[in-house]
Structure formats: structure tokens, C-alpha cells
Amino acid sequence: MSLPDSETLMKTVLEKYPDATDLKEDIDVHMEEFKAFEYRFKLTNVVLRALTLPIPKLEDESEVVFEGRSITYHWTFWTGDDEKKIVSWVNYSPKPIAIQTLKNKSSHRKKDITYSQYIDIKGTVEPGFVVPKNYFVPHPDPDLQPEDAVVHYQILTSMKDSIEDMPHLMSETKLDCEMYIKDRFEELLQEYQESKNTYYLARADFYRKLKFEHLDLDHQLLISAANRDWIDGYFLEKELRASYSLKIDSLAC
């Protein structure tokens, strides 16, 4: 079974990453990084490599400047046999380090500006003004999309093989999970503090009670991969709540 030509494969990449390039001169500069990631993810039968390069921006007081790599790497590869080849795609963007730069001491933080504006607005509100109730309906939690399942399975299998060969990597996996759970807890708690919506408090409570030891191996590795931006973890919360809410005595939203 023959594969589509590189131009056709590249069109699929461009649908999601319109700034991606597969120009040889761009790829050659980063070939060592491509090879290193291919070895880590155990990617074989690669038929297309592409890059999305960061777009330079001018810095100002409010802009976040990223240090380190912020490139997205794209691969097209096939699995199966010569009779039936299954084409898959992987997109990987190493997580950059965010550093807030301040031009001078008089620069205001976002919180300061927000509070100042709140005081100004509060002074214009007439006494006795009541805000109508807003009936909140949360969006359904997303499931893993079929088009992502093949890639996620490939990465999960690769990580399991690595753990089997190098058991000491579990300590890194545990650190990734603890960091991911802590980040989600803090994000949801912040949502609750800003909105006073108990929906976010219930979700934050779930992450407060969830521990690395509660998770099975697949979920440990998937969370680790999401924390490293190897996969998009949009589907994880629904799976985690369905699997562990009763076990840890936390409300399943």
C-alpha cells in the first residue's frame, strides 16, 4: 500500500498549524532535535518532518517573554505492515519557561490594575442595585477524540517500555503527576475565588484529594505526558473523576 505524497501529508499538518514549514533548510538546522525526540518517543517509519517556528514579538511591560525552545515539531509516520499502512501524526512543543519582565518599579501588576478599576466602578453603582441571577450550565467534559487515540496509545506504549527498561524514571513520573495535580488545583481554586461558583470549588476539591498513589499506571503516564506537553490532556479530567471520585470521597461534578 503506497502512502500519500509529502505535499498531501503536509496539508494535514497545515490544517491545524498554518505556519508550519517542511523546507529542507529549516528541517536540517533542527535535525538533531528531531532525531532525539524520535528516539525518545520510539517513532519509526517517519515520512514527513515539519516545524512551526516561534514568531518574534516586541517586548513591553505586560508581555510574557519565553526563554528556551518554543518550537513545535511535527512528524508524519506510519504503522502496520506494507499491506495496510496506518498514517499518524505527532505534534510536540517542549514547554517553555515563562518569565515576567518588568521595565521599571512603577509598572503595575495585573491585580493592582484590576482592583483599581473595581473601586472606580463600585463608586458609580447606585445603592440597592441587584445583579440578576445567572443560571450556570457547565460544558460537558470532552472525551478522547478518535483521531488522537492512535498517537496517545503510541506514546503510552513507548513510556511503558521506557519504565520497564529504566524503573528509576518512575520518580520523574511521580514528580510530573504531583506538579500537574497541583497546577490544576490552583487553577480551579482561582476560578472559584473569582467567580464564587461552587462548580469550580468541587473540581478543585477533587484535585486536592487526588494523590499519585491513587492512580493506575496508565493514568500516571498519561498525566506525566500531559505535564510535559507530549499530549493534549483535554480528556483527562473526565477519566480521572470517573475513575477516582468515589475512591477518594470527592464530589463527581
Swiss-Prot record:
Species name: Caenorhabditis elegans
Source domain of life: Eukaryota
Protein name listed in UniProt: Uncharacterized protein C03B1.4
